[in-house]
From Swiss-Prot:
Pfam families listed in its UniProt record: Fimbrial
Purpose: Part of the sfmACDHF fimbrial operon. Could contribute to adhesion to various surfaces in specific environmental niches. Increases adhesion to eukaryotic T24 bladder epithelial cells in the absence of fim genes.
Consequence of gene disruption: Deletion of the operon under classical laboratory conditions does not result in any major effect on E.coli capacity to form biofilms compared with the wild-type strain.
SUPFAM superfamilies in the cross-refs: Bacterial adhesins
NCBIfam families reported in the protein's UniProt record: PRK15199.1
UniProt entry tagged with the keyword Cell membrane: no
Protein name (Swiss-Prot/TrEMBL): Uncharacterized fimbrial-like protein SfmH
InterPro entries in alphabetical order: Adhesion_dom_fimbrial (IPR000259), Adhesion_dom_fimbrial_sf (IPR036937), Adhesion_dom_sf (IPR008966), Bact_Fimbrial_Adh_Pro (IPR050263)
Length: 327
């Protein structure tokens, strides 16, 4: 028995458009100088100044595009946490949710993230000529989920990547423009630790073989933890406020800070020897300010082997940062 198969290829008008300059442009929001003692409160929604003008971006679709309309997609890597008044709030940072609206000249107000929004027509689309991506009146809203204390650096990050296509099926592979945010947030609420001095734990000389004998994650025999009392003094923070202290570090292995000798590291812990995991928002030491907005927090620290290997002999050190937050 013979089997016959007739396969028909679809004629596709799908095209992926690009920025007419060949490079995706960026619409950036600087979060510096946005927060103050009034709006730096949990649940507070802060509306950034509206970017009322057109974003000034033009796209171009390749030869072979047979339609004069386009679709626009606003793609994000952040996860929507809640929706308020149609605004889709995503967690952009430990302290902030963020949401946005914008207006298209034809489709009116949009609340990204959203994919394949049918936009208006322009005769240049099918002529391989530049046409305007008519986004304007961008409104960026921030919701404070954890009030800031002191200065917090928010690295520049892309909130939305915007794509233009000629069908709702085209792959989203060529960005036309991006919307980003970042900045240095400084607020009046301030806490000084250890009178501004570095907290140093010095363990002296330790035999290299003691680390390999201890094994990974363990403290060398005969080396005792050291204890420091960290004085905290806050300004523009309410007396008796409940706060937390946590640890930030650039090199981390499990619960340890990794030193400049990759085989060695340090554990920082509370007074009960419970480790504070670096860069973990939930690994904290809770404490309460007194009537003078001050407190003392006990820290303990000890060196450990990271790899279980015998380390290269010589000095080793690690640098971490203590951060105070509201509970």
């Amino acid at each position: 028995m013979a089997m016959a198969c007739l396969c028909l290829a679809n004629i596709s008008w799908a095209t992926v458009c690009a920025n007419s300059t060949g490079v995706a442009e960026d619409e950036h929001y600087d979060l510096s100088n946005i927060f103050n003692s009034t709006n730096n409160q949990p649940g507070q929604i802060v509306v950034l100044p509206e970017k009322s003008g057109w974003v000034g971006v033009s796209a171009i679709c390749p030869p072979g595009t047979l339609v004069n309309y386009t679709y626009r997609s606003y793609v994000t890597n952040f996860i929507v946490q809640e929706t308020i008044d149609n605004y889709k709030y995503m967690q952009l940072h430990d302290y902030l949710l963020g949401a946005m609206s914008l207006v298209d000249s034809v489709m009116d107000i949009q609340f990204p993230p959203q994919n394949y929004i049918r936009m208006g027509t322009d005769p240049n689309v099918s002529q391989n000529l530049p046409f305007g991506v008519m986004d304007s009146r961008l409104i960026f809203r921030l919701k404070v989920i954890r009030p800031f204390i002191n200065m917090v650096e928010i690295p520049r990050q892309v909130m939305f990547t915007v794509y233009v296509t000629s069908t709702p099926y085209d792959p989203l592979v060529t960005p036309v423009y991006t919307i980003s945010f970042g900045g240095r947030v400084e607020v009046p609420q301030n806490c000084e630790l250890n009178a501004g001095q570095i907290v140093e734990f010095d363990f002296g000389d330790i035999g290299a073989s003691l680390f390999s004998a201890a094994g990974p994650g363990n403290r060398p025999a005969g080396v005792m933890p050291q204890t420091k009392s960290i004085a905290v003094k806050c300004t523009n923070v309410a007396a008796q406020a409940y706060l937390t202290m946590r640890l930030e570090a650039s090199a981390v292995s499990g619960q340890a800070m990794v030193s400049d000798n990759q085989d060695l590291g340090f554990i920082v812990a509370d007074q009960n020897d419970t480790p504070i995991t670096p860069n973990d928002l939930n690994s904290v030491i809770p404490f309460r300010l007194d009537a003078a907005a001050a407190a003392n927090v006990t820290l303990r620290a000890w060196p450990i082997s990271i790899t279980g290997q015998k380390p290269t002999e010589g000095p080793f050190s690690a640098l971490g940062y203590l951060r105070v937050d509201y509970q």
